[in-house]
Swiss-Prot record:
Zn(2+) 2 binds at residues 135, 138, 160, 163. A zinc finger (PHD-type) spans 118-166. Component of a complex composed of KMT2E, OGT and USP7; the complex stabilizes KMT2E, preventing KMT2E ubiquitination and proteasomal-mediated degradation. Interacts (via N-terminus) with OGT (via TRP repeats). Interacts with deubiquitinating enzyme USP7 (via MATH domain). Interacts (via HBM motif) with HCFC1 (via Kelch domain). Interacts with E2F1; the interaction is probably indirect and is mediated via HCFC1. GO terms for biological process: epigenetic regulation of gene expression; erythrocyte differentiation; neutrophil activation; neutrophil mediated immunity; positive regulation of DNA-templated transcription; positive regulation of G1/S transition of mitotic cell cycle; retinoic acid receptor signaling pathway. This is Inactive histone-lysine N-methyltransferase 2E. Residues 1049-1068, 1203-1213, 1389-1421, 1451-1463, 1488-1498, 1519-1547, 1585-1603, 1647-1656, 1706-1716, 1806-1816 have a biased composition (Polar residues). The keyword Transmembrane helix does not apply.
Length: 1868
């Protein structure tokens, strides 16, 4: 008992404890844990099968069990759990519990022999009505009244109806007890009522002030003892029969029922908590005057001045009476009734008589609530008043007040509160409203919404009023508590906020229970021990667990509160109610302990995580029911094992987990049923798990790491899946909700849930350290983005800890994720096999993302291993390092796609990855990983690789994948990205894909590298910075080195920087990886787009994310991502973004690896630095966190890669020329990202949503085998969607697509830089083929990709596309292309174009590279590498470059083609087929590009474009020719020109179906341009060199030259021009002209910003782009850096708030993110915007690109200028990248934008404003070149003129949708 007492937090803690404990201490311990564990599973606590909900083994929420049926075995279902569960299950509401328990409740008797008291009555209620009798035979408690026993003559020996069968009136019993329950609030039956109230109260108190509860717990024990004694006495009195009322035996846990009594006067009511109430009654400072908070004084004075003293006159008179208290003696006297003091009239009072002034501390209600006081909690003496001109105030008389505080609330009040203003201060007086006879209690109406109160609200009418709404509500709530546990839980969440007030009061009460709480804690700690098992169960339900925690906390608070009342009640009926109360207290204690445990879990996760996880696994393995009981026992047994502190921590984490245990189980089941997409619900958990895994991986040796990597991707994907469609409402949704809630609450609920962990790791650095320690938090995307909320929310420690333990046991020490468990469970052997088989492992790497969770992935022949691989991405990556070191064909298969030649457009796998089927579309919708195939970008992500493989291989059914993707959502997208390429390789293109894998993989790895950037962005950034800056050569070497070389460095990097190595894991194998790596900032991005493009599938996945945000961003990397890439216009920018996305979003898994490499602390530090410096590390986190962030990352990806490299470079690389732009951009972006990241956190959901939207489209791409069919379907859908969305896009849907295309394009540009050659070669054939076959197929695929994306992206495209298919394509391209085929293809095309450009100007480019190489090397060693790779690419082209570049290549190719077709691309986009073709082509036809880098590609593009947009193609071609000719840089320019032309031409072509492709193409085109751009970006990253050479060489050279400086500027530029336009600087020099084009693509531009930024935004903003204004805003916001927000042109309005951009850069970014997220649909249209995004999002790289594109658009206008502009854009892209990260991050986080704001502000003001203007113009915004130019600064204007001309043309041609949509993206 003593223990029970300590345990009991409430006054009735003893009862509670007893009840919870049952009769076994073990049980007690277990119950506390259980109670603590699950928010709404007290029943579960009672039993695994606790009737109420799912059986949560370790459901700590015993309270829920109150409502739930207690388990047969006491230990299994401790009553406390039930008690606590009341809130959720009506723990405290005895009626609820009774109903729930069906009259079987376990409660412990007070006496030492209080075994488990089971309440089983014929009435079916388990509440203690105060008169209960115990059967002498079976010891079951029954209501005396129900059993027909005369209370006056209780038999000495009593047998229940079962032991002594007899006829009983059940109906009468039910009615009687129901009535009692309703009246319980009175106090007699308050046990039940209080049960209701208490849990909530307890919950609130606990949640709100877990600490305070803890503190208060100490006081409670004594109080509890006293209460118990009193209760015992009361109970004796109550029961004439000892049996009926075993004073000691049955403490009525329900005693808390009295709490409701208290509640009635919750504001000023006297709670029946004897101790507390008495203390309050006796201990309050008599107030002779009021105390006013500043807020109240200020508001009152303001109102008084405004209103004069209208109320004063009458109030003054009254107040005069009242004021002179000496003269006025209140005609009332306080009486103690039921332990409550009430105010009775001392004489007969007439109506309107002044009774008394209500004195106390006046404060605004917000202040009161902010302090945690809220009406939801029955605080005794708080009066709420809102009649003073609507001023919500309250008077807190709890510690300072007068007798008026004792006035209770009643449904039939006889007095009211009136205010008077005296001497400028407000006074509240109680006036009678009717005649009040002497001795009548004075009551006032409820001044708070008792209906929302969790606790039982006590009404002073004392049931005199049969219609009492309060009692009705109470009874309803009681019943609802049982039936509406879920609702309650949700409500609990809300109530948590409101409960905070109660919490404070509860805290007061908890003080009493403090000792008890502490005591309870020890048992709880024990239970915490049990927790490991529960943890495993709860792994899947971490979000829920958090919810549960939150709710539980309130419940605990309520319990606490009630316990006081219960004590009073106990005096009357100490037996069962007391016990119940004790149980509640215990539950409360458990909650507290759980919180503690959670805190400890954070600490312990690193150390004990592995241990706990395995246990979790075991427990999970155990049957649910079995597990519940077993776990309880096991935990009990284990308790001793774990240190108490650890236990507490464990308990905390476990409690959290426990909450999820049931949920996790459910989720697992759901996952199994839903093809393991449960992570969606366990999103956060997955994230946590991923983080955990990542940490674990970091801790784990390389192989383990690999395994972890493999696992992580899956977990990560789910995390990304925050916005997956499948489990939108589940974890992700809840988590998002919770996150926002937490943000709103600023950690109040969060405090309870994650606060402790946060407390433990509130400091990002500390958190980082802890996270590092904690495998779960390994990758910091989430932790970073929303370190506090996400981390605690995700409780990566908990979830991942659990998961890791589980996984680790199954696969490896590291693989403990729930998703892993799922995957393991679902495909344990397969995964393991794969895991073990090297080949499979390689595959596995790609598979990891999806495979873990989805048999789908496993369904892939290689998928299984691959599925595991993502988990083992690292291992894969290691294998890749070892086996695929160079460019091993097998595993890299996904990347094999890059082997354009090998993989023909017809290659099903190849085609398939590009567009997952409709199924995949579903994925995309649900998971948006539809781009999964595109996810190759995610290759960087361990999981990505796995996913990629899945996607790539037909075996990985789109459906399966879709499920997986849906389940894994964003995380999966990365995985899918990886998988796509891998799958391709797995399919028929193993060898081919291998190359592609290398290319793709490399990109992916690169992405991973970058991704690690997000996760380890800081690290990667540092490393990359180091690599870029310190080790330009090394980076170059790394990048240039074959994938394996890169992989090694990458691996090391990955290991060191989780991301890089991991990223490479998937694709590092191929030399391209080096390119990717060196492009990590720029190249990585480039490669990523390439590989993604190449893979098409991989890109798609990425695109999914990119489409979403990340998807878009990644999209540029992925096929769809390619759009983003292209859009990024910064292959590097977008590629980076993609990479970043991959790293952060797509490559979340990668991120984890990177995280592992870098301590969380360091990572955080880096991220922080990145944020500060504007690098995109944070964005990575963001992206990881959210698709949009991913999009942000996209730009960040570009930027992130850039940010990582560039961002980190930005940090370090600020000095690096290219990186500097990126760095500047990154810095800006990072800064923005920081904000972005954090914003990303919140935005993440939106982005996720976006992702979901886009994912669906992407999903189609995922369909490997039916790529063409899917593409066809998708394409058509894309067209339809594009049309719709385009229209909508204008409304903001298209932006996504636009973004995507832009993004795709952007990366291709960047990629193009590096990848173009590869792509050129790869793309040429592919493009050709695609042109021929893929045109339909690619187009189709693109369309498909586009389509799904178009859902998000395409719609806008279509919206744009009404007039022009292009938009569809852009949208599609963005969505679809990004998705996969298109995206991939586009990426390829773009890359190809880029490649063409590169190839065409390989030498120029090389020269640029060479000349800029130093800069690049410095800036972007990777970029230099990328360029080198580009140079090499031609050589490597077939292999890695092709792969890497392949996607971009197509992009590039397309762009070159697009150069001419760029407009065509837009045009082509408009005419889906051609672009699609190209897009498709790029996938397989990467070779196509390669061959005709400049011309053929253009032709291909042209053909492609020509097919749909011959005419435009021609002009563009001509232009393209010129521009193209102009390129190296010109290629970009050419591409841009073409693209611009295309865009311009697009106007005409828009109608053509090719739009999707076109869109895609456009994205690609931008890619080409962007490739150039990317090259620029590369220049930035990679194009620094490029800038120098091609840029300079190109007409764009000038621009690009500017870019070079710009580049330097980009990164630097950011810094330098950063202020102006981060991008502008880059663009300024070079971009100016390009910006204008982006303006034309305005939306796209903006989208590009969006794309980048939204490419995340592109995706999100892309649509916005369609919205253009919005998009623009987004773009601008996102990419407003990019003044190219030109996208603002479309989105200008959106973006319009250039100030927004500037100011709102972050804001916008946030908005952007949100918009992007929100606008994801719009973003699709922004595929055109993607360019904008590229420009803007390209981040100014993207924007630049977009802008560039406009220049390109006006290639003729400013061939050189435009081209230079393009380069600037690339620069800008890079910048964008930097900025991109910003924009992208912007969407993701404000960070990039922030940086952008730096540049962006200038850019924004300039760009946004300008762009807004342009945006206003529509795409004229493109012309906004001025705007863009502004963003781009110098070039912007230049561009402005050309672009305007051209843009106008563009506008004219593409105008409708295309221009907006397309232009930004499509044509951008």
């Amino acid at each position: 008992m003593s223990i029970a007492i300590p345990l009991g937090v409430d006054t009735t803690e003893t009862s509670y404890l007893e009840m919870a404990a049952g009769s076994e201490p073990e049980s007690v311990e277990a119950s506390p844990v259980v109670v603590e564990k699950s928010n709404s599973f007290p029943h579960q606590l009672y039993t695994s099968s606790s009737h109420h909900s799912h059986s949560y083994i370790g459901l700590p929420y015993a309270d829920h069990n109150y409502g739930a049926r207690p388990p047969p075995t006491p230990p299994a279902s401790p009553p406390p759990s039930g008690l606590i569960s009341k809130n959720e299950v009506g723990i405290f509401t005895t009626p609820n519990f009774d109903e729930t328990s069906s009259a079987t409740t376990i409660s412990t008797s007070e006496d030492g022999s209080y075994g488990t008291d089971v309440t089983r009555c014929i009435c079916g209620f388990t509440h203690d009505d105060g008169y209960m009798i115990c059967c002498d035979k079976c010891s079951v408690w029954q209501h005396i009244d129900c059993m027909g026993i005369d209370r006056q003559h209780i038999p000495d020996t009593y047998l229940c109806e079962r032991c002594q069968p007899r006829s009983l009136d059940k109906e009468r019993a039910v009615l009687l007890q129901r009535r009692k329950r309703e009246n319980m609030s009175d106090g007699d039956t308050s046990a039940t009522e209080s049960g209701d109230e208490v849990p909530v109260e307890l919950y609130t108190a606990f949640q709100h002030t877990p600490t305070s509860i803890t503190l208060t717990a100490s006081r409670v024990p004594k109080v509890t003892d006293k209460r118990r004694k009193k209760s015992g006495e009361k109970e004796q009195n109550f029961s004439k029969c000892k049996k009926a009322f075993r004073e000691g035996s049955r403490k009525s846990s329900r005693v808390k029922g009295s709490a409701p009594e208290i509640d009635p006067s919750s504001d000023s009511s006297n709670f029946v908590w004897e101790t507390k109430i008495k203390a309050w009654m006796d201990r309050y400072e008599e107030a002779n005057n009021n105390q006013y908070s500043e807020g109240v004084q200020r508001e009152a004075q303001r109102l008084a001045q405004r209103l004069g003293s209208g109320n004063d006159s009458k109030d003054m008179n009254k107040s005069e009476l009242s004021t002179n208290n000496s003269l006025f003696r209140p005609p009332v006297e306080s009486h103690i009734q039921k332990n409550k003091k009430i105010l009775k009239s001392a004489k007969d009072l007439p109506p309107d008589a002044l009774i008394i002034e209500y004195r106390g501390k006046f404060m605004l209600r917000e202040q009161f609530e902010a302090n945690g006081y809220f009406f939801k909690r029955p605080y005794p003496f708080v009066l709420f008043y809102s009649k003073f001109h609507g001023l919500e105030m309250c008077v807190d008389a709890r510690t300072f007040g007068n007798e008026a505080r004792f006035i209770r609330r009643s449904c039939t009040p006889n007095a009211e509160v009136r205010h008077e203003i005296e001497e400028g201060t407000i006074h509240l007086y109680i006036y009678s409203i009717q005649s009040i006879p002497k001795g009548t209690e004075i009551t006032i109406a409820f001044d708070f919404d008792y209906g929302n109160c969790k606790y039982k609200v006590d009404c002073a009418c004392l049931k005199e009023n049969p219609e009492c709404p309060v009692l009705k509500r109470s009874s309803e709530s009681t019943e609802n508590i049982n039936s509406g546990y879920e609702t309650r839980r949700k409500k609990g969440k809300k109530e948590k906020d409101t409960s905070k007030e109660k919490d404070i009061q509860n805290q007061n009460m908890t003080l009493d229970c403090e000792g008890t709480n502490n005591k309870i804690r020890s048992p709880e700690t024990k239970q915490r021990k049990l927790s490991p098992l529960r943890l495993s169960v709860s792994n899947n339900q971490e979000p829920d667990f958090i919810d549960d925690m939150e709710e539980k906390t309130p419940i605990s608070n309520e319990v606490e509160m009630e316990s006081e009342e219960q004590i009073a009640e106990r005096k009357r009926k100490m037996t069962r109610e007391e016990r119940k109360m004790e149980a509640i207290l215990q539950a409360f204690a458990r909650l507290e302990k759980r919180e503690k445990r959670r805190e400890q879990a954070l600490e312990r996760i690193s150390t004990a995580k592995t241990e706990v996880k395995p246990e979790c696994k075991e427990s999970q393995v155990i049957a649910d029911a079995e597990v519940v009981q077993e776990q309880v026992k096991e935990e009990t047994a284990i308790k001793p094992a774990a240190a108490k502190v650890n236990r507490t921590k464990q308990r905390k984490s476990f409690s959290r987990s426990r909450t999820h245990i049931g949920q996790q189980r459910r989720r697992h089941r759901t996952v199994s049923m839903c093809s393991d997409i449960p992570p969606s619900s366990p999103d956060i958990e997955v994230l946590s798990q991923q983080n955990e895994i990542e940490n674990t991986v970091l801790a784990i040796e390389p192989e383990t790491e690999t395994a972890v990597a493999e696992i992580i991707p899956e977990a990560e994907v789910p995390a990304l899946n925050k916005c997956p469609t499948k489990y939108p409402k589940t974890k992700k949704h809840l988590v998002n909700e919770w996150l926002s809630e937490k943000n709103e609450k600023t950690g109040k609920p969060s405090d309870s849930l994650s606060e402790r962990p946060l407390r433990i790791t509130t400091d990002p650095e500390v958190l980082a350290t802890q996270l590092n320690s904690l495998p779960g938090l390994t990758y910091s995307p989430h932790v970073y983005s929303t370190p506090k909320h996400y981390i605690r929310f995700t409780s990566p420690f908990l979830s991942e800890k659990k998961r890791r333990k589980e996984t680790t046991e199954n696969i490896s020490g590291s693989c403990k994720k729930r998703w892993l468990k799922q995957a393991l469970e679902e495909e344990n052997s397969t995964i393991l096999h794969r895991y073990h088989s090297p080949c499979q492992e390689r595959s596995r790497s790609p598979t990891v993302n999806g495979e873990n969770k989805s048999p789908l992935l496993l369904s892939d022949s290689c998928s299984l291993p691959d599925l595991t691989t993502p988990l083992k991405k690292r291992r894969l990556y290691q294998l890749l390092d070892t086996a695929y070191s160079e460019s091993s064909t097998p595993t890299p298969s996904p990347y094999a796609t890059p082997t354009h030649t090998d993989i023909t457009p017809t290659d099903p796998a190849f085609a398939t990855p590009p567009r997952i089927k409709s199924d995949d579309e579903t994925y995309r919708n649900g998971y948006k990983p539809i781009y999964s195939p595109v996810t190759p970008v995610t290759p960087g992500t361990p999981g990505n690789t796995m996913h990629f493989e899945n996607i790539s291989s037909p075996e990985s059914s789109p459906e399966i994948k879709r499920c997986t993707y849906n389940q894994e959502g964003y995380d999966r997208p990365s995985n899918m990205l990886t998988l796509g390429p891998f799958r391709n390789s797995n399919l028929t293109e193993l060898g081919l894909q291998e190359i592609k894998t290398i290319g793709y993989t490399s990109p992916r790895s690169r992405t991973e590298v970058n991704r690690p950037c997000p996760g380890e962005k800081e690290s990667v950034s540092d490393l990359q910075l180091g690599l870029d800056a310190v080790e330009p050569a090394a980076l170059q070497k790394s990048m240039e080195t074959p994938a394996h070389d890169r992989t090694e460095p990458s691996n090391q990097l990955d290991s060191t920087h989780s991301g890089r190595g991991t990223m490479y894991s998937s694709w590092v194998k191929s030399p391209d990886r080096t390119g990717v790596n060196f492009s990590v900032n720029s190249n990585l991005r480039d490669l990523t787009p390439s590989h993604q493009l190449e893979t098409g599938g991989g890109f798609r996945v990425s695109e999914s994310k990119c489409l979403i945000q990340q998807d878009d961003t990644r999209g540029m990397f992925l096929g769809a991502a390619v759009f983003c890439t292209s859009e990024d216009g910064l292959a590097s920018g977008f590629g980076r973004t993609v990479n970043d996305n991959l790293i952060d979003g797509s490559c979340t898994p990668q991120n984890p690896p990177q995280k592992k490499k870098v301590s969380l602390l360091e990572y955080r530090k880096r991220q922080r630095e990145a944020r500060k410096s504007g690098s995109k590390p944070e964005n990575f986190a963001l992206i990881s966190v959210s698709p949009h962030p991913s999009g942000s990352l996209s730009s960040s990806g570009d930027g992130c890669v850039h940010s990582s490299e560039n961002g980190e470079q930005a940090e370090n690389q600020a000095s690096l020329p290219l990186p500097p732009p990126a760095a500047a951009a990154a810095a800006t972006a990072a800064a923005a990202y920081s904000a972005s990241s954090e914003e990303g956190s919140s935005n993440c959901p939106v982005k996720d949503a976006n992702s979901s939207e886009k994912k669906d489209p992407e999903v189609q791409w995922t369909a490997s085998t039916s790529v063409e069919q899917v593409r066809e379907r998708s394409y058509q859908r894309a067209l339809l969607l594009s049309d719709h969305r385009k229209d909508k896009d204008s409304g903001g849907e298209s932006p996504c697509v636009s973004c995507s295309p832009s993004h795709v394009q952007s990366p291709p540009s960047s990629h193009s830089n590096h990848i173009p050659q590869v792509h050129a070669q790869s793309l040429a054939p592919s493009l050709s083929e695609l042109m021929a076959d893929p045109d339909a197929e690619g187009t189709e695929a693109t369309s498909t990709s586009e389509c799904p994306s178009p859902d998000t992206s395409q719609s806008p495209s279509k919206t744009s596309k009404p007039g022009s298919p292009g938009p569809i394509n852009p949208a599609q391209s963005h969505g679809k292309i990004l998705t996969k085929p298109d995206s991939h293809w586009e990426a390829t095309a773009t890359v190809s174009e880029a490649d063409n450009s590169v190839h065409q100007n390989p030498e120029p480019q090389h020269r640029q590279l060479s000349s800029n190489t130093p800069a690049l090397s410095q800036n972007h060693a990777p970029q230099a590498h990328a360029l080198s790779a580009n140079d090499q690419l031609p050589q490597k082209l077939p292999s890695a470059p092709t792969k890497l570049h392949c996607p971009p290549s197509p992009h590039t190719e397309n762009p070159p083609k697009s150069s001419t077709p760029h407009t065509p691309v837009q045009h082509g986009y408009l005419s889906p087929k051609p672009p699609s073709q190209h897009l498709g082509s790029p996938f397989r036809p990467h070779h196509s590009q390669s061959p005709q880098v400049g011309t053929p590609q253009r032709e291909t593009q042209r053909n492609f474009y020509a097919a749909a947009q011959n005419l435009q193609a021609n002009p563009q071609q001509a232009t393209s020719g010129a521009l193209f000719t102009q390129t190296p840089s010109g290629q970009s320019s050419a591409t841009y020109s073409q693209f611009n032309q295309q865009s311009l031409n697009s106007t005409a072509p828009p109608p053509p179906p090719p739009p999707p492709p076109s869109s895609y193409y456009q994205n690609q085109q931008p890619s080409a341009n962007f490739q150039n751009y990317n090259q620029l970006k590369g220049s930035l990253s990679q194009q620094t060199v490029f800038t120098s050479g091609p840029n300079q060489a190109l007409p764009g050279s000038t621009s690009q030259q500017s870019v070079p400086g710009h580049h330097v500027t980009p990164g630097h530029f950011l810094p330098s021009q950063n202020p102006t336009i981060h991008h502008q600087p880059a663009a300024a020099a070079v971009v100016p002209p390009p910006p204008p084009p982006p303006p034309a693509p305005g939306p796209h531009l903006i989208q590009q910003p969006s794309s980048h930024q939204q490419h995340s935004v592109a995706h999100g903003v892309g649509p916005v782009h369609a919205v253009t204004p919005g998009s623009h805003i987004h773009s601008q916001t996102a990419g407003h850096h990019l003044p190219p927000p030109p996208p603002p042109p479309g989105p200008a309005p959106h973006h319009h708030p250039p100030p927004h951009p500037t100011t709102g850069l972050q804001s916008l970014q946030a908005q952007h993110q949100h918009v992007v997220n929100s606008a994801p649909p719009p973003p699709p249209p922004p595929p055109p915007p993607p360019p904008a995004s590229v420009l803007v999002s390209g981040h100014h790289s993207a924007s630049g690109q977009a802008l560039h594109h406009p220049p390109h658009q006006g290639p003729p206008l400013f061939p050189a200028s435009a081209h230079p502009a393009v380069p600037p854009y690339p620069s800008q892209a890079t910048h964008h990248t930097t900025l991109g990260p910003g924009p992208q991050h912007q969407p993701s986080g404000t960070g990039p934008h922030c940086p952008l704001p730096v540049a962006g502000p200038h850019l924004q003001p300039q760009g946004p404003n300008s762009i807004p203007t342009p945006t206003a113009s529509g795409f004229c915004p493109h012309p906004h070149p001025g705007s863009v130019a502004l963003p781009h600064g110098v070039q912007g204007p230049q561009q402005a003129s050309p672009v305007p001309a051209q843009i106008p043309i563009h506008r004219a041609q593409v105008p409708p949708t295309f221009q907006n949509n397309y232009h930004g993206s499509g044509w951008h």
